[in-house]
């Protein structure tokens, strides 16, 4: 079990993570948790995140500790029609990212369950086929706010997702070398996901693994107490039968 990794971590710089997630604090906690290799992957969703990304990039080289660190970024969908994401090759060149993670983050105004599934599948395929993307983030994650609105209350398991979607995603991942993320925070500890959903999700991960897909694992922590969720993601992959040699890790950044 690869509980030495955490490849999706947010910081207090961008603002989606709280004040506990300063770089010094989160790096110290990762050391305490026994992590060996982590990735800092804060959001770049638009111009408002350029300055915080610059601040992270300037601060990271001051770390002088045992952790191997990869400088990365998380993108979301910029255009649901084309599948374009918010991070471009120009951003990668400007900031020197060594790891780009991306994927859908919603239902994109759809209300019909089958339409929500269809658009998310289409956007996941577009993300995986984007040449700058290294890992598809938290497949089939939806905000808990959608349950509060009543738009995702039907999503108690994965029975509506066609088997063909698994086949198509696996084929695209293997063809492009893009990994699928196992996310402790967004999936395992999601406030609205049922045990039945998580059982189905384990079968989903196992099916992708059987077809040769590789995986990254992470906490997706926005609070320092949730950095431990990467261990839960590692255990989930192990329980799904994913061998360690199908768990991917990006190159370590040389600052």
Regions found by a protein language model. Name each.
Residues 1-12, 21-23, 85-97, 143-145, ...:
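Charged catalytic cores and adjacent phosphate/nucleic-acid-binding surfaces used
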Residues 3-5, 39, 71, 135, ...:
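Residue-level marker for buried hydrophobic side chains located in beta-strands
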Residues 22-39, 59-63:
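Alpha-helical scaffold segments that flank or form the walls of functional sites
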Residues 32-51, 221:
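A short, flexible N-terminal coil/short beta segment enriched in small residues
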Residues 44, 49-182, 238:
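Extended substrate/RNA-proximal surfaces in nucleic-acid metabolism proteins
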């Amino acid at each position: 079990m690869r509980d030495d990794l955490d490849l999706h971590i947010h910081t207090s710089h961008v603002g989606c993570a709280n004040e506990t997630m300063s770089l010094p604090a989160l790096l110290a906690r990762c050391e305490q948790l026994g992590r060996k290799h982590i990735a800092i992957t804060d959001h770049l969703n638009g111009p408002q995140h350029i300055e915080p990304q610059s601040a992270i990039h300037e601060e990271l080289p001051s770390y002088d500790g045992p952790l191997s660190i990869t400088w990365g970024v998380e993108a979301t969908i910029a255009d649901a029609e084309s599948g374009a994401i918010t991070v471009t090759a120009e951003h990668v060149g400007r900031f020197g990212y060594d790891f780009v993670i991306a994927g859908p983050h919603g239902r994109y105004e759809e209300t019909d369950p089958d339409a929500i599934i269809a658009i998310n599948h289409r956007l996941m395929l577009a993300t995986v086929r984007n040449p700058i993307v290294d890992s598809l983030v938290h497949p089939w994650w939806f905000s808990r706010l959608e349950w509060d609105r009543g738009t995702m209350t039907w999503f108690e398991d994965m029975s509506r997702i066609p088997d063909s979607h698994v086949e198509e995603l696996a084929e695209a991942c293997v063809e492009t070398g893009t990994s699928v993320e196992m996310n402790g925070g967004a999936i395992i500890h999601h406030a609205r996901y049922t045990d039945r959903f998580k059982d189905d999700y384990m079968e989903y991960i196992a099916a992708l693994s059987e077809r040769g897909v590789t995986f990254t694992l992470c906490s997706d922590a926005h609070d320092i107490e949730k950095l431990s969720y990467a261990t839960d993601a590692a255990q989930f992959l192990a329980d799904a039968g994913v061998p360690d040699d199908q768990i991917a890790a990006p190159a370590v950044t040389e600052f």
